[in-house]
Each structure stands twice: as C-alpha cells, then as structure tokens.
Amino acid sequence: MEKSGPSSTISEQQLQRQEGWINTKTDLAEQSLISSEKWLQLHGLKSNKLTLKQILSQIGFPHCEDYVASLGRPVASRYADGLFPQLYRAEDGRVYNLTAKSELIYQFVEHLTQAVESYKQRMDWLTSKSRQIFGVILEQCVTIVLDFGGILEGELDLCREALTMVLQEQVAHITEFNIIRVSQEPVKWQENATPVTEQSIATAISWVEKLTVELTVSEAGRLDALLEAGRDKTIESIYYFVVGDVPEESKELLLQRALEIPCPVYTVSFNARGEGTIAFLKDLSAKTHSRFHAFAERTECVEFPAFSTKDGDNVMTWNSRKLKGKLPPGAGVREDVFLVWQEMEEACSTLAQIQRLVAEPPKPDVATVDCESETTSVEIASNPEDTWDSKTWLQKYGLKAQKLSLYDVLADCSFRHADGVVDIKAKPENESVQTSAETNKKTVHAKYCSRFVHAPWKDGSLVHVNITKEKCKWYSERIHTALARIRRRIKWLQDGSQSLFGRLHNDCIYILIDTSHSMKSKLDLVKDKIIQFIQEQLKYKSKFNFVKFDGQAVAWREQLAEVNEDNLEQAQSWIRDIKIGSSTNTLSALKTAFADKETQAIYLLTDGRPDQPPETVIDQVKRFQEIPIYTISFNYNDEIANRFLKEVAALTGGEFHFYNFGCKDPTPPEAVQNEDLTLLVKEMEQGHSDLEKMQDLYSESLIMDWWYNAEKDGDSKHQKEICSMISTPEKCAKPQSDVDSTQTSSLNMLKGPWGLSDQKVQKKKVLHAESTKTSLLRSQMSSLRSSACSERKDGLSNASSRRTALSDKEMSILLAEEWLDDKSSEKVTREGSQVYDHDSSDVSSENWLKTYGLVAKKLTLMDALSVAAVPHSSTYVPVLDKHVVSKVFDEVFPLAHVCNDTNKMTLINPQGAKLNIYKRKVEQAIQSYEKRLNKIVWRALSQEEKEKLDANKPIQYLENKTVLNQALERLNWPISLKELSMLESEILAGKMYIQQAMELQEAAKKNYANKAPGEQQKLQGNPTKKTKSKRPDPLKGQKVIARCDENGFYFPGVVKKCVSRTQALVGFSYGDTKVVSTSFITPVGGAMPCPLLQVGDYVFAKIVIPKGFDFYVPAIVIALPNKHVATEKFYTVLKCNNRREFCPRSALIKISQNKYALSCSHIKSPPIPEDPEVEDVEARNSAFLFWPLKEADTQDSREPRREKPRRKKRPAKQPLQQAAPSDSDGSSHGISSHGSCQGTHPEPRTAHLHFPAAGRLGLSSHAIIATPPPRAALPCTLQATHSSKGLRSVPETL
C-alpha cells in the first residue's frame, strides 16, 4: 500500500478536525443536552469526513467510466489500468484507484475507532440515569407538570427519587425552570419560572420530597395545570410527567383542547398500566408538535452507600442510582437511541473495510516493471497478460470469472419449483374386508408457480425466474463489455505472428527453417514472418536458436543463446542473409535441436516432404517425444506432406499450422487447431447464447406479468414496455455491429462458430405433439391485427372474444411474439449467407444438394407446417356406409392436407406455423442455388464467350437462359446438363413452396374473416346471456401468518378463501376462523424467498410457547450470528417492546419498514388485573416479570352478561392465549425462542407467564422454562432497581 501516485495528502485543517474526537469529551453532560440529530451533525461521520465515500475520495480517486451513446455501452478509462490497487464500492458500483500510503490509512482507522467509541458513550449516556426515565431536556426554560393521579402506594418514593435525579442531572444545566402539580387546583412550586442555581435546585428537591398522594383529581385538573404552565411567557416547553394511567374523561378533554396550550407538551409516561395511555400521550405530543418518552420500572430500588458533593459551603448527600426498567408496550423504539445506533453500525462497517485495506492491500492488475534492469536485458513495455494462454486469460476475464454466465446471473432472481405429496382418500378395493378409505399419495404443485416463467436449471431441476427490465439492461451492458474484451483478444491473436505461430508457451525455443529449392518463392515471406515472430513473442522468452536446413543443417549458434538485444539483432541479420539451398534434410535439423539438452520446444517451418522416409523421421521423434514440435506448412496443397507434419505434431503434443499461398484467407477454417482461439470463440459463442436466453426469459416474464397483473396494475405500463421491445429491437436483441464483425472474422479462424447453430438445427428432429391449451390460445392470437381491432370496435363480449377478436392483452402478446419471430428471422438472415456460401466447385451439384438442398435443410412446406399439424384419420361407420371424421379440430385446424396415394389426412393450422420466417429461409436458399448455378455456368464459358456477353462477372442464368445455352452449345456443353437441371428444379421447388405458403396465409385470413361475422351474430342473438369469468383465488389454501384483532399479534393459519379484494377468510391454528384484511396477511411456506438479513432489517420474529400457540411479533435485527463459529446460528432482534430476542433464521420473516410500523401500532395491551396470587408470584420472581394481556377488564366483561342473561352456555374452544414476552437481560423469559438449545445451557430460568382463562375472568398461571441465549451474544447492560430505602445504579449481570 505504500505505492506512490498522485498526491492524496489531507490538509492540516482536515486532520485537525478529525483529531478533534479526543477533545469532544469536555463537559459531556452540558454538551450532550441536545437532540441526537443535532449531535450527529456535530460528531457524525459525514461532518467529520469519515464516511466510506469521503475516505475513498481522500485516499484515491474514482475510476472514470461513462456511457457512450454511439457505442451503446459503458466505456471505462484505461490510462490507469494496472497502475493502482483498486477497491470496489458496492453502494454505488464505482471502482476507486487507491493512491494513499499505509500511514494515512492507519490514521483513518484510528479516527473511525474513536468515532465508534464516541457513539457507544452517547448510547450509554442516553440509556442511563435520568435520561432513561425522563429522556433528554433540550430547551433552556421549561416547566415540569406532575400528574400523580394514577399513582400506586409503593410508587411515590420511586417518583420522588426519579424527579430528584432529573433535577440534579439535567435541570441543573439549563437556565430557568418551574414545577406544577396536578390537583383540584394547580399547585405551583414558584409563580413563574425561576433561574437555575444551586439553591433553587435544592429548594425544588425539598419541595418534591414533600409531595403526597392525592386520591382524587378533577377531570379538568390536568388541563388547568397545563394551561397554567402555558401562561408563563418565558418558558419554551412543558414537560408533562404522568404516573400510571389517565382517566378516559380527561383524555378526551385534553385532546379536544390541546391546541389551546400555547407551548409544546413533551409527555413522559412513567409505569403506564396499558397501551391506551401510551397512545394518548403520543397523540397529545403530536398535536402540540413535541416529543414523547416512556418508561416502566421492573425491579425495586437498591440502596448504595451515600456520597457527598461539596461546592463551597453547600453540602448535599443523596443516593445515586439507576432504575432497572424498560420501554412499555406500544412505546416503540427510542428515535434518539436508534439514530446513534445506526451511525455506529455504519462506522463499524466502514472501519472493517478500511482495516482490510491495511491488512491485505488490493493487488494491482499488472505488476510494476523495474526500469533499472540490466542494460543487456530487453525492455518490456507491453502488458504481461499478452504472454498468458487463453485458459489463464479466461480465468480472469471469462464469463464465469466475471460472474456473467447465465446461471450466475439468474441465481438471485430464481427460485425452486414447489411441489409436495398429499394424501388422497380413495375407495378400498375390497369393501367386504376393509370399510375405511385407502390413502393414495399424489404429487401436487404450488398454484403460484404458474405465474412465473419455467426454466431448467444446470442440475436438471425446474426453477422459476422473473427477469426485470433493469436486470436485463444491466446484464446486456455487462455482457457486451465482457464480449468486447474477448473480441479484442481474438483480434490480437489473429494479428501478427500469433496467426501463424500461435502462442509461444515455452522458454527455450529452437526454430528450424527449410531453405530447400522448393522454398525459393516463399523464403522472403518466411523471413518476414520469423522476424515478426522475434519482435512480438520471442523477445519475452529466455533462450533461442535457429537452424536452417537444405541438404545439411546449419545452426546459428552451437547451443541456445540468451535473449537480449544484441543476440536478437544478430539473429535477425542472420535470417535476412539466408540463401536458397538444395534438398530437404529434415532429420538432420531435428537431430541438431534434440542434441541441445535445454531444448523445450521446436518450431519446424517447411513446405514439403523430408528427404528421408517419413517413418525414419517419426522413429527419431519418438525418442524425444517429451519435446513438443510445432509444425508450420507452407504448401497446403501437398496432402501427403501435411499428413506427415500433422502426425509429428500430434505425436509430440504440438500443433499443426499452415500458410496457404494464393488464397485471400491464408488459414481455411477446416484446418485450424489453435486451442487459444478455440477457447475464446467458444466463450464468445456462450456469451451470445446466454444473452439471447436472458432476453427471451425477459420477454416471457414481461408477457407473463402482464397477463396476470394487467387488470390490477393497468395496461399502460406493460404496453409501453412491449411496444418499446417491438419498436427498438436493435437495442435489446441485436448484437452490436462490432459483435457481428467479430463473428465474421471468427469464421475465418475456426469452422464458422456462428454457423454451428444451424448445423445443430438441421440435425434436430421435428417433434409432433398434440395441441395444448397454451398453443391453441397462441394460434388464435396470431390472427391479423387489423381484423382484431375492427372486431373489438364492434363491442363483442368477453365470452367469445377469444374466437372473434383479440383483446388488448392478447394483441400485445401477439406483437411480442411477432417481435421474437422478427428477431429470429433477422438472425436467420444474418447467418444464412454463412451457411449457404459453401460453394465448392469440385463437388457435384447432386452431392452439394444432399447437404444444402431444401430437403436436407428441412425447408419443404410440410417441414414448416409440422409444428402446427396433427395427423388425422377417418373412421368407417357401417350404418352410414361412409368414412366420417371428427369435427372437434375444426375450430383450431381449419385446413386439411390429404395425400393422393394413401388418403391419409393431416390437419393444419397455418396461423400456428411461422410462415414468414419460413419464406425468408427459402428465399435465402434460392439465392444460394442461383449463385451456384450462375458461377457454374460462368466458369464453363470461355473468355471469348464472356466477351461476347459483354460481362466481367457471372450473370443470371435463369434470366438469360437462351443466350447462355447457345453459348454452352457452341462450346459442346463443357458442363453436364443434368447438373443445371437439378439446380433449376430446386429453385423452382423453392418458389413453389413460397407461393403455397402465401396461399395458406390468404386462406387463413379468409377463414377468419368468414368465421367472425357468424360469431358476432350469435352474440347479437343472445344479448342477455353472459358468461361470468371466474377469477382465480390467489390466496386460497395459502399458508399465512395473520394479525389477530384481540392483541395485534400474528398467528399461523391457512386462507380458506378471499371474501373480497381486500379481505380474506383465515382459519387460525388455534381453532378460530376470522375475516382479516389482506394488508395484515403475510404468506409463508413453500418456495418463499429467504434473503440475507442485515443489521437494521425489519422482521417478524416467531415466539414459541410450549403449552400455547406460537405467534409472531415485529422486531428489528440488531446483531448477526458469528459466521466463524458453527454453533452460533442465532440472530439478535429488538422486539417492539424494546427487548432483545435470539432467533434462528427460520424463525424470522423479513418485512418492510412500513409494515413494521403498522404492526407495532396495532399491538394492544389491556391493563393487568390486580390478582393477589399474581402479585405474590411477581414478588417472588420480580426479575422475570411479564406484562400479560387480557381480553377485557372486569367492568367490560360483565356488561355483555347483563345484556344476554339467558344465553345458553356452550363448550367453548380453548381461546387464544395472549401473551407478550419480556426479557430483562436480553433473553426471552416465559417463552422459548424457536431455536433455543437447552443442552447448551443446563441451568434454565423459570418465569411465570399468565394467560386469561377461557370463559371466565381471572388468570391462570403456567410456568414455562426459557433457556437464556448464549452469553457471548449479549453485551453487559445496566438495570435499575428500586426499594423503599434508596435509589442506586448497578451494572446488570448476565
């Protein structure tokens, strides 16, 4: 990381600002009396330039990349390619080139560590002492209104101590304050707000300690106290401290007249009995544009030894303590704590990434070049990747390495097909022996699977995919970028010495040069090729030597010479001076190369056979079989010599290359065996195939999505997308022009890679299958758009629109199918010329047509109609003495083909066949036949006859048949008349097939036009008869979790049916059946997505009750399991009651933030009944107190009994046991998490959870064992306890 680059040092001012973390702890109490939002503006990551983006901009610079419209793809700069270590930032997808040294990065690590520590201190400060009870006082002049109307006898001392802590820790740091108590008449401590002094604080504490319990408070007393506090014009805010609950009458009065209170009312709930008071105080704060805080104590106060603080003559002794409490149900997560926690999580994540830069610095793509090498060494200025073979190169830049293969891209947008085995009851075989029904197993498939595109996976299984427009566009851009890189590599390999010699893999090379007399006309070219080979490849190797051989072999050096500038220049000069010799002593040259023990590879350049028998040479080669021999032939027409050279190369593991003189392309594709090019071309072929498959899947997904969701979402969105696909197919379907050029050039190097697809197609057998429901629908939708539009204007009903007119949805699907047809036809047009240009003049037309004729290419009309044809036969009826045929296919297959010889019938639907594509293919074939016919006739003409015709290129034979036949007759027919007639017959057959296809299309149009008016008359004749289409029930039978109205929790169940668009009938697992809004229903089970959870995600957490019914509660993920420890599989979540829970991944369902807020707002908690038995249990085990829920209080439950006194008592079902978990130390007491393991923790704690009894008032308690979570997952928290003796702050033990 100490690599120097452009200057990236930080200014001293920035460093001083970041080092200011050390100086931020001055006067923490006074400094922190601000909101978390303002605090983060001062000390957050962004303000101190410590976000990941800001740090990366200071230690590096972003790699430039922009979209070039003319090229149609993103283009990245290459000026810094390999010079800098790079870091990929996943948030915005940008790549940064790092230029900073390690010392600078260590400074950022230190600053981030200090920031994390500062955030932890802030969170501890917010959740300790008076801030836990009262929140944070943000204003400088306040009035505290005390409402003790709902206080219990044992809570007065606790309230006094809590208020004392608030006065000493927070009020002492503001300017003015006052205290008012709610009573029959408001009781003021002072008439107006008093400046804060030590004496005023001591007086206020003394006044608070003298407060007593007042039994009755008038309904208007609370409003009068708040209005009285608001009359003081100097105060900025009113802090309304409510102990217990507020009567319903006072709630209504306060909410009605809340706007009369002139100041914001900050409400503080202390020990609220139910969620009603919490909701009321939230509404009151919201109406007065203020904040809300809530606290509920859990244990008694614990007295600590007293200590004194002396300031002058004033001595004050008091017990400092911390309440051990919690947030009450319905209070939600504290916003000020959550903001700091979020910032701390971001700081931890950024710190981890920056630390990785120091621990394992990113390696640059290209190693640095030492410019101070020896003077005799060769200066290497090119990219070392040029020395790689294609296999190594593809390991870095191939599709799999870039994660651009089809299965890699589909991994995050596909899911497995869901099926299962169910029991079907059936009638027993022998009823006399068995009367009960037999159980048969049947495989059923999930209903929702039909709404997704089916695709086979690489392991043979079936998956469903859903490709979005953004996904398809992203993949298209990335794959084009990757293919362009491969295309540049192919072009580089085809240029220069690589095209003849291939890639040079070994370090010690011998080059044997044939200088026999037969090489006279080729020697200059061979010299140029060898010199080019030296300059481009050989200079990167270690040692080399040259041997020229004719009658005898002469070496340039006795042994291999080192690669340096002097030797390379001398070798080039020696090669230029080579002269022509006599014979070809190949064996002597090979022996010279074999004699050098350092030889690793031999390149043999020759144009003919050796002087010695080939067997003798091969026997010598077998002795040194471990040394590869790369043979290069300069006489491709000598098959015997080339066979010998191929055998030598194959025997030693080398390769055979050749240069064909007199040919425009010196390397015909059928002879190329270059493995480097083969791998690259296959990779490009795979890339184009994957891109085409991705576009096809996207088209199917778009059509499928529209088909099912058009009525719900509207057609406009899908119509725009499909129309854009049809109007601009070149943007998403056609490869770019440079891709086409690469395909063409690749043909010259490797057996026409883009023509292989057609060869595969011709081998593929045509499958004849019966029509399915989908194919019938597709065939009906392929009618003319104009007829469909006119029929729709006639106002036909939905019942028969499938037969008489196309709906908007069907029309757009038809347009999409036609677009796909056009795309494939363009591919046929683009590739057709490559297929039919194989015009070997030495092959007879009869043999040529066996490969490229209409029958061989399956281009007869019956081949085209086979996909939309069904064989049919008549049945003889003796009564009628006739052969009759079924009319069941008349609607779908309007035409029939009867064979004259066998009278066999084939039913045909022309609309089901792609006749337009078929006609284009036949036209392409006819062009190739005409081209061959014209060339054959032209070659047969003499030069004199060509001059008579006044033409310098082949002319059309069929248009000038008479003139050309006369010329051939004058030449005594140098070519066979049979050959011409065969090609002419093939051309006429193709034109006949095109005419018949056009007639079939016209017949289909007429059949459709004749059928439509009859269907319309039927509709007009029966105007009252309407067929109501039955909409599918999407949720019927679906396993879900649904909200229960009694307590707001989510319970498992099964949807029985959808009552309406917004409501569904759910059968709960506890036996009840209720109508639930679909917004409170979450599907579970089957092939549901299971995304990775991150800190801060919102989830439903499953709460398992051994003797009750499981349910789900909303929660937030606050900690992830340790990946390095296999046994730790628990996520830590913060439930809606601000308590932690430990759950496995299977017990969590990810939800959105809106759903989390909605679920929290509907969770209810009725008051706790005052049961002596319960209070006794709580006194014995107060550390594990739960807040039970009850269906109704005593008064409410008695009223229905008075209204229906004679109602007959029926045996009631076991009611839903309403319970909410509580955990004093972060674990779940009274309930067991889904994945708790009692074997790991042998000492479980016992908690008492109370459920309302069925059919009566009161409570029944059940003791439930709850195993605490692993201790390592919990941080040490602080708890507050209380007693009659005093107030203390103690750390909570786990």
Swiss-Prot record:
* Statement: the UniProt record of this protein carries the keyword Disulfide bond: no
For this protein, the record's SMART domains field holds:
VWA
Alphabetized InterPro entries for the sequence: DUF4537, VWF_A, vWFA_dom_sf
Record field: compositional bias (Basic and acidic residues): 1193-1202
* Region (Disordered) residue spans: 732-754, 778-803, 1012-1036, 1193-1247
Q: Where is the composition biased (Basic residues)?
A: 1203-1212
- Quote the cellular component terms of the Gene Ontology held in the record: cytosol; nucleoplasm
- Provide the VWFA domain boundaries: 508-684
Q: Which UniProt keywords apply?
A: Cytoplasm, Disease variant, Intellectual disability, Neurodegeneration
Q: Which Pfam families match?
A: DUF4537 (PF15057), VWA_3 (PF13768)
Q: Where does this one sit in the cell?
A: Cytoplasm
Domain of life of the source? Eukaryota
Coarse class of the protein's main subcellular location: cytoplasm
Point to the regions of Low complexity compositional bias.
Answer: 778-787, 1213-1236
Q: Where is this chain compositionally biased, Polar residues type?
A: 738-748
Annotated PANTHER family: VON WILLEBRAND FACTOR A DOMAIN-CONTAINING PROTEIN 3B
Q: State the disease link.
A: Spinocerebellar ataxia, autosomal recessive, 22: A form of spinocerebellar ataxia, a clinically and genetically heterogeneous group of cerebellar disorders due to degeneration of the cerebellum with variable involvement of the brainstem and spinal cord. SCAR22 patients manifest variable severity of intellectual disability associated with adult-onset cerebellar ataxia.
Q: What is this protein called?
A: von Willebrand factor A domain-containing protein 3B
* Primary gene name: VWA3B
